[in-house]
Amino acid sequence: MHTLIRSFLGLWYVLGALAQTEIKLVADENVTLPCRHSLGHLGIQSLDIEWLSNISDHGKQVLLSYSGGQVYNAENHKGRYSFVSKYLEGDASLFIRSLQPSDAGQYICKVKNAGQYQWSFITVIVLVKPSELACSSEGAQLEGKNVTLNCKSTAGTKPLNYRWVRVNLKDNVERPVQSTARIGPENQLLLHNLSKTDNGSYRCEVSNEVGKRTCDVDVTVQSVSNTGILAGVACGVVVGVFLIFFTVWLLFHKKEFKKREEEEFFNEIREDAEAPKARLVKPGSSSSDSRSSQSGSSSTRSTTNSASRSQRTHSTQETPHGEQRHHCLEKI
């Protein structure tokens, strides 16, 4: 590296200072990469500071620089990188806002002052905390049955360490899980042959070197008899609701059927009352006598039985002949 620097500076006198550091930092936090320098006899007038990154396939990129009394930011990184407050007094450390896993890689601090160069190489390792946990219970929580408690972290720097404990949520006191419990191949907790003693809260803890996450799963074991009673009650409620709706439906349709019967009955009576009445009329009878005979005959039929009705009909038919003879005598 010294040979490369000498060839690059040509005839300049170079006092090269190299520093190599590896730093582990946590994602999503604001971090500072250290770089210190000493002002030469010319002071800040000959001071140049440059921060470069070597974290992509495009090679080295300038992130931040100071030259000629001005600070320059890379266009695509504005707002994320800056100098600390005393960069002109010997502290040229780089401030990075909200470190991301993609920021992992090598960073280079290059300071030139009065013909002297100072290099700092920093390798950044970004550590990620475990992600939020997804916890669940699988299986019927009944006496004698088996239940699986699942716990999963989808992100985080490996290795991720899983741990299950029982916890009293009132005072947050943890204690070991029962001896009959087993840890599955995917870090799930297996509870076999459940009993009332398995009731309670179970806590899953996932941790790595930079942080940890926890989640709780509740287990409430029910006896089979209680389950049968609850099922019977549920069925009874369903049947009861069905009977209520069926009774209401039946009463409604019965009322509608009765209403239709009454309407049909009154329609039949109305049709019978309005039907035309047939009668026999002899030729030669006057229209007035016919109307009088019809009115008398109709009145008589409405108040007598069938036998009387027949006799009156016969007498009514004979009356026109007598009246006709009477008119003939008057004419003579």
UniProtKB/Swiss-Prot annotation:
One of its GO terms (cellular component) is cytoplasmic microtubule. SMART domains: IG, IGc2, IGv. Glycans are attached at residue 193. Pfam families: Ig_3, V-set. Residues 1-19 form the signal peptide. Residues 276-332 are annotated as: Disordered. Residues 320-332 have a biased composition (Basic and acidic residues). Disulfide bonds join 35-109, 151-204. The chain crosses the membrane at residues 232-252. It is found in: Cell junction, Tight junction; Cell membrane. SUPFAM superfamilies: Immunoglobulin (SSF48726). CDD domains: IgV_CAR_like (cd20960). Residues 253-332 are cytoplasmic. Residues 20-231 are extracellular. InterPro entries: CLMP, Ig-like_dom, Ig-like_dom_sf, Ig-like_fold, Ig_sub, Ig_sub2, Ig_V-set. Residues 285-310 have a biased composition (Low complexity). It is a single-pass type I membrane protein. Residues 20-123, 130-220 form the Ig-like C2-type domain. Keywords: Cell junction, Cell membrane, Disulfide bond, Glycoprotein, Immunoglobulin domain, Membrane, Repeat, Signal, Tight junction, Transmembrane, Transmembrane helix. This is CXADR-like membrane protein.
